Regions:
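N-terminal mitochondrial targeting presequence
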Residues: 1-36
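A short Gly-Trp-Pro
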Residues: 31-166
Length: 166
């Protein structure tokens, strides 16, 4: 009985799927959640992009492709190609992820309360497709320290973005 139960796992609330027990126990493997919205996700996304955008994971700090990008242009949602951030609003917060103080236009990003990991944070998502971008933090003193127009830091996963040069 225990062997049979070990060959199943919960992938989302109320959904159970069968897994290969020979590979399911490997710690480096991550399994994507299966959702009813699967068909709405860009088929060209990498596994890492799917984990970040759809399953709300966070890429490792200091590993993102756009962390040190200084080119002029616009950052778009990697899933739906919606413009989200202008390069002029990007700044170096030294947090390990690209940081922006303002979205490209009001309403491009949606804000949601996130109480995961025992912390109260605000999650930011693409308003068009709902893809997870990262989190927003306020009141950290960036306005005074760097002379930014806003004291807001959008901490964004590079995996959730595509960059288009001007």
């Amino acid at each position: 009985m225990l062997r049979v139960l070990a060959s199943y796992r919960v992938v989302s609330r109320g959904t159970i799927s069968r897994v290969n027990t020979k590979t399911a126990l490997k710690p480096q493997k991550r399994y994507l959640k299966i959702t009813a919205m699967s068909q709405n996700w860009n088929q060209n996304l990498t596994p890492e992009q799917l984990l970040v955008l759809r399953d709300k994971h966070t890429e490792r700090p200091h590993t993102g492709a756009y962390l040190h990008n200084k080119d002029g242009g616009v950052y778009h949602c990697a899933n739906c190609d919606e413009p989200l951030y202008k390069s002029e609003t990007k700044f170096d917060s030294q947090c390990g992820w690209p940081s922006f103080y303002q979205e490209v236009r009001p309403g491009a990003i949606t804000y949601h309360t996130d109480n995961t990991l025992g912390m109260k944070r605000t999650e930011i998502c693409c308003a068009k497709c709902g893809g997870h971008m990262g989190h927003v933090f306020e009141g950290e003193g960036w306005k005074e320290r760097l002379g930014l127009p806003e004291d807001v830091r959008h901490c964004v996963n590079s995996a959730s973005l595509n960059f288009k040069k001007n």
